[in-house]
Amino acid sequence: GNEEGLRDVAKESMNIGSVYRSYLQDLYRFFKLHPRKAQFDDPFKRDQLFTRYTVLESMLKTPAYLREMASFLMKREYYQDAIAYMEEALKHETADAETLQKVAFCYQHTDRPSKAIYYYQQADLLSPDNEWILKQMYLCYSALGRYEQELDCLKSLEEMNPGDTRLISEIGLCLMQLERYEEAAQRFYELEYKGERVVPSWRAIAWCNFKMGRLEQADKYYRKILQQDKVTWEDYLNAGHTAWCLKQTTEAIAHYRNYLQLYRSKRKDATQPLLSPFDEDRKELLLHGLNDLDISLMRDILQPEPES
């Protein structure tokens, strides 16, 4: 009899919790979705952490409820509101890896990667070698331009997934950001050998060799790229730089004119001067032995007629 009574009490308690949740969720849907919602004062537009309201505090200030409400908000991509619930839950219970991951994920999706990293690092301590956490951390480090830390995360992931071509590519790109072009090129040679992501790898190999002053090797790869179907204006521009630095001026001009033709149709901002990408690379050209007079003369040759 006592056992049945305890079961009934537990069942009733669970039912009360379900009623609370259902009631609040129905309220939320009403104030957010009802056709006449504009006629009512929406309490959800104010402080979303209901536990700060005295009348609701005793009912709602439980970690289980706070976590559940946070998950409800996360699914609907109300990340800032979800953060408030999860951080409140963390005040009342020992942090676990899952909750920390969720807080970090919400910060990541509200464009606060530094705060996201703070929580991902805590989650990583509780759940070491978690691939999902490492992946999110490297994305946050990349967004912050913290490429050394991004590289550490990527290499940890690579140890767990040897031979993963996507990771090889990401590591190569990260090494390029760090201006470690020799190491980066080796990563892309590996992809070329595997027959994976071939044309993007050629682009990276060509640019790494250009940056290292290995112009003949860069030229070899740009020639291969320009024989492909989907050539970009960047391909023509970089091939032009390489040819010009090799003193193949006629060929360089031909590549530059192809770049201008493609860039005219592909640029996102029609007011952007057609030669602005060329001008942005002035420093690279100077480093490879050209001078300001050379560059000014080339600009005069390439200068397109004013657009109507």
Annotated model-derived regions:
Residues 88-91, 121-125, 155-159, 189-193, ...:
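Conserved structural position within tetratricopeptide repeats
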